[in-house]
Amino acid sequence: MRLGWFNYYLKDIGAEPVSLVQMQRNDGAWHLEETWPPKDAEWLEMGLDQFQAIGSRVSTTSSITLESEVFENETHISGLPTLHLAVQALCKGGQIFATMKDATTGLRLGHGVMDLRYRDGGYDAKVTVPFLSYTMKMEFNPMDVVIPAGHSIAIELTETGEDYLPSPDCAVIGMNVETTSSSVLSLPLIDRAEEDVRWFKVIEPADPANASS
């Protein structure tokens, strides 16, 4: 594949190689896809009323923890999950940092962050009025992860996280979040059987330290 790319694009030799995506899942497994996110992904929508929720406000001193029911089957999330949150502003802005984890093992799976003023996406801030309700259309960073059968997922909603700065004016006050069916987590799922030809193994380079003299 790499030689074909080199010959066609750099030496103008041969036919144009097929463009494929090589994606590594969080457990180390590799799979080939024509596009990524995969075109055949099916969306699983979960209202937050289906989660066990602790907390109702996100600020510098309060957070919300959500835990799903157990997944009966192994579940492969491949793409950009979305989290649409119904919130009540308590200030003229504010932000939410959402972290997704495997609730059974504590393994971090991904995150997303959004400023309430950019609740519909894009680059233009919108006016936010205290005590009015809005929908934050959050999107997680790209994820290709597996949830083993019998595990559940957790969503932690905090005011900030990683290397993000707190909201400059509204962090202490925060905002209220409806953990009801009005707030929805959507997961892009794909099904790849163990014998699917799109799975492949990467040959690891030999360790020079173990090479015979």
Tell what function each PLM region has.
Residues M1-W5:
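Extracytoplasmic/secreted proteins, especially bacterial periplasmic and envelope-associated proteins
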Residues N7-S213:
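Glycine/threonine-rich phosphate-binding loop and adjacent beta-strand/alpha-helix elements that clamp
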